[in-house]
Amino acid sequence: MQISRFTVDLPGAFSLKGGGILENLTDSLTRSGTIGLDMVTRNLNFLTGLTGVTPDGSLVIPDSMSLKMKMEMNGPQYKAKLDLKEGKGSMNVNAALNSSTEVYTADLKINDLQLHHFLPKDSIYELSLSADAKGRGLDVMSFHSLANLNLSLDQLHYARYHLSNVHLTGNLKGALATAQLTSDNELLKMTADAEYNLAHSYPDGKVTVDVTQLDLYELGLMPKPMKRPLAFNLS
């Protein structure tokens, strides 16, 4: 089945182009297909009212935002790609899943995305980060499931605070979830390690936190800078 190229143009709101092809949809081994969509936004703020959010300007959908999506299917293998551009910022997402083996991968890249354009009444601004995940098995309680997660926060501007060099890694193996968080910036220098056994019916985990520098003055919690940085260890 071929999906003819189509165009949807709602003046003042958005324009959408797309098309694709689908074959053997009822056969789980030989089915295949590709669908692509290109969208450019104009004024979509009427959608915020449909979601139940009060249309007070606290949440908006920016004008002239470009969104491209592509979805592919080949037997049990599924792939999806999303590219978003808003002003000088961008977001790219890639994901893949094999429904037979339950093997999956995903990666996310956000570069200079201006969150203030989406939340104009909040004090949140530029965001840059990258993340990737891969694993096997969709049941996190299963001893056979495996997963790895990596996340790096390169830049987050919130109010007068600038966060950077924050890294999170996570692993799942044998129903044991482990995570490590590190932060190395002027506001906070720390490491944290945690683990939790998902197979037990009772809470079974531990956390260790080592803070070598916490700037309470920059956080607005102290009237003047401290002579020595605050440091502590918790476990």
For every predicted segment, state its role.
Residues 1-235:
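Interface amphipathic segments
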